[in-house]
């Protein structure tokens, strides 16, 4: 069981690197590609768009394929998206790379939680999910500074090349450590949004939207702000 949790935690670490790593390389990216810093900041939004679009769509396939195969597909998208971003030299291709790399983000957390709920004893599921999510925290503590260092010493492309290669290792860990199980629950896209008929979810959405907007409005441009304004 520990290997399953570790595999999923490695996956969330890679997702955290991809999501937040862009913030530490924003100025280098803008200079290298020949776009403005605000335009480079759009890459953060494209990733977020991929997260929003990807999660509900992937959920539709949770009953058609094994959860292990879905996880492998999601991590493969991480590899492809970050590789595309690494090799891109135009705004359009950068945007597509970020969109693809963001697509599996929300779905990975959801599918990973389902896997853990099926193989972990009921009283320990919460701790197991926390272990999976800890990969994101470690990415913020260790991964992002490493990515920023690589960008400053070599190139921002090395940062995202590292993320792509790391996700290949994540695919191997999922293949060997995650059991081949299925989620038999049936559903369709419309059913996923039935809960929006009540006002309570909209209040939660508003709170999280404005809260995250406040954080990311500062966090996204913290490097150019510290370099050119403070």
What does each model-identified segment do?
Residues 93, 122-176, 221, 225:
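Helix-loop-helix hairpin linking two adjacent transmembrane segments in secondary transporters
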Residues 34, 66, 87-93:
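Helix-breaking motifs and short loop linkers at transmembrane-helix boundaries and internal kinks
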Residues 97-135:
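Cytoplasmic helix-loop-helix junction between adjacent transmembrane helices
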Residues 4-37, 58, 218-223:
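Extracytoplasmic
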Residues 202-230:
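Extracytoplasmic gate region of multi-pass secondary transporters
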Residues 6, 81-84, 92-100:
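Paired small-residue
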Residues 69-83:
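Structural signature of the two symmetry-related core transmembrane helices
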Residues 55-66:
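Helix-to-loop junctions at the C-terminal end of transmembrane segments
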